[in-house]
Regions:
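The DNA-recognition helices of helix-turn-helix-type DNA-binding domains
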Residues: 107
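Basic nucleic-acid-binding alpha-helical/helix-turn surface characteristic of O6-alkylguanine DNA
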Residues: 1-95, 143
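Structural signal for hydrophobic
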Residues: 75, 115-116, 140
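Short Lys/Arg-enriched helix C-cap and helix-to-coil transition segments
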Residues: 111-120
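Generic structural "secondary-structure junction" signal
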Residues: 58-64, 120-121, 127-130
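DNA major-groove recognition helix of helix-turn-helix
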Residues: 104
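…primarily DNA-binding HTH/wHTH and HhH modules…
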Residues: 124-145
Length: 145
């Protein structure tokens, strides 16, 4: 496995790659940096995100069951600067909002699968399991608005 850490205004973000695809994104620093094609694309995409150009797009592979993949696919459709509620997503798949939250918490590719854009129906933030937690979620949403 290869990895690359990028320093951002929100701290370090590290991508881990295997077989040419990103398999994990973490909000911390890894001291072992590689420069594979997919990691370089990740870094460019991250830099574009922080220039407020667009959402993050890169090749990744994520494991999950059928409903997880459907929910994660729906999260990818939430545009930069917008949010959806756990309930809105839950209705589409006939599952509970809590189940959507659990699926968000299992997301190994935050930013590309923007679980930070999912909030409670009352407008409060809900949870965020990435390092930095709810404070980081709030910063990301503020940055995107």
């Amino acid at each position: 496995m290869n990895s690359l850490s990028v320093k951002t205004q929100f701290g370090w973000i590290t991508a881990i790659e295997a077989n040419g695809k990103i398999i994990r994104v973490k909000f911390d620093k890894n001291n072992k940096n590689s420069k594979t094609k997919s990691l370089i694309k990740f870094k460019k995409s991250l830099n574009n995100y922080f220039k407020k150009k667009k959402s993050i797009v890169f090749n990744y592979k994520i494991r999950g069951n059928k409903i997880q993949k459907k929910v994660w696919g729906e999260l990818k459709k939430i545009p930069f600067g917008k949010t959806k509620s756990y309930g809105e997503i839950a209705k589409k798949f006939k599952i509970s909002p809590r189940h959507v939250g659990k699926i968000c918490a299992q997301n190994k590719i935050p930013m590309a699968i923007p679980c930070h854009r999912v909030i409670r129906s009352d407008g409060s933030l809900g949870g965020f399991t990435a390092r930095g937690g709810i404070k980081l979620k709030k910063k990301l949403l503020k940055f995107e608005s």
